C-alpha cells in the first residue's frame, strides 16, 4: 500500500495529497492534544486521529481538501522505478455530524507485484470547534465506506463528550 502513496506527481496539490495520505496527516500537524489509532487486516486498514488544531489552519486545510476533487480529479503519479499510477479523487459523503465536514475517495491504479492492483481509500474529516476527527479506511481490496462512516459518527460523539468535560464510554458502541 505504501508504494502506491509514495508515487510522485508534478501537480503541487496532488503531490501534497499523496504526501498527507502517506504521513497520515490530512489536516496538517496538530497544535493541541492528539490521539491516533489504526487497525490492519490483510491489505486493508482503518486509521482514526482525533486532535486539536489552530482554527484558521484547520478551516484552511478542510477547505483545501474540498477543492481536491476538482484540482486532482484524475492525475498520473510515478512510482519508484518509473511505474505510472492513475489516481482519481472524488467527493464522498460524510454523516451530518460536527460543525464542518468533508469526505474524499482516492483510487490509485497501477501494478503491485507484477499484477494490476487498485488501492481505494475512503477519507472523512469532521471539525468540532477547534478539534477534528479524521478517519481513513480502505486498501487493495476496496474502500471501507461503512466502517469510515461508523467511525466518524462514534468519533465525533466521543469528541463532543470530551470537549463538554465528560468522559466517553470505554466502549465505542456505548455512546452516552
What do these predicted regions represent?
Residues 1-111, 115:
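A small/polar (G/S/T-enriched), proline-flanked helix-loop surface module common
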Residues 76-83, 143, 166, 173:
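Residue-level signal for alpha-helical context at structural boundaries
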Residues 87-158:
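A short, solvent-exposed beta-edge/loop patch
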Amino acid at each position: 500500500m505504501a508504494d502506491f502513496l509514495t508515487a510522485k506527481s508534478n501537480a503541487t496539490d496532488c503531490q501534497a495529497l499523496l504526501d498527507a495520505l502517506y504521513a497520515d496527516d490530512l489536516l496538517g500537524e496538530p497544535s493541541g492534544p492528539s490521539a491516533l489509532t489504526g487497525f490492519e487486516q490483510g491489505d486493508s486498514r482503518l486509521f482514526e486521529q482525533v486532535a486539536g488544531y489552530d482554527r484558521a489552519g484547520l478551516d484552511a486545510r478542510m477547505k483545501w481538501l474540498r477543492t481536491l476533487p476538482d484540482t486532482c480529479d484524475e492525475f498520473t503519479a510515478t512510482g519508484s522505478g518509473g511505474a505510472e499510477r492513475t489516481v482519481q479523487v472524488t467527493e464522498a459523503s460524510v454523516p451530518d455530524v460536527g460543525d464542518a465536514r468533508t469526505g474524499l475517495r482516492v483510487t490509485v491504479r497501477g501494478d503491485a507485484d507484477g499484477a494490476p492492483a487498485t488501492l481505494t481509500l475512503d477519507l472523512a474529516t469532521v471539525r468540532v470547534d477547534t478539534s477534528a476527527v479524521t478517519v481513513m479506511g480502505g486498501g487493495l481490496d476496496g474502500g471501507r465506506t461503512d466502517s469510515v462512516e461508523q467511525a466518524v459518527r462514534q468519533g465525533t460523539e466521543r469528541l463532543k463528550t470530551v470537549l463538554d468535560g465528560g468522559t466517553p464510554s470505554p466502549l465505542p458502541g456505548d455512546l452516552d
